[in-house]
Amino acid sequence: MERTERGRLDHLLGRDIVHQGAALLADPLPQPSLQSVLEKPGPIVILDQVSDPRNVGAIMRSAAAFGAVAVIAQDRNAPEETGALAKAASGALETLPLLRAVNIARTIIALKAANVWCIGLDAGGKPLSGPAFADRRVALVLGAEGEGLRRLTRETCDEVAGLSMKGAMESLNVSAAAAIALYELSRL
């Protein structure tokens, strides 16, 4: 352990990083294989170019809370495991695997081959109903902030579902939508 001034941490980590006066240098967490994830029961969350580390962290926290076994993000166009992501995840980064995939559509195809029902979440989809998936292993696929699911990702999913919204908003932040969808899927 080394003690240093707060200003030095600001300089080392960047002024926009909330470090609360502490920093740790650690090895990366091990990444399990997709096969080992498939051996565990529970939903899987797939992120299609979700780029804000705070959204990814919040999604991981919700995924851990509602029994997901892993979150899969693309190896590019997705944030690294930074302090901001870890802070938003509130411990989920240490308990829930974050896998990296080269190609999201191919990952969905591999999951479908393993009898995982892949549901893309989109504002224009039919209403999501957790009880309708009671007898299926499910992967919830979430699109990027603003753009949503990419065309190939959407076409590769088994179905596209949405959240029933009665208010004045047309859509939700991806992390809020993920939490609601994961809750709905957990009501089995």
Ranges and model annotations:
Residues 1-188:
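Post-transcriptional modification and biogenesis factors for structured RNAs
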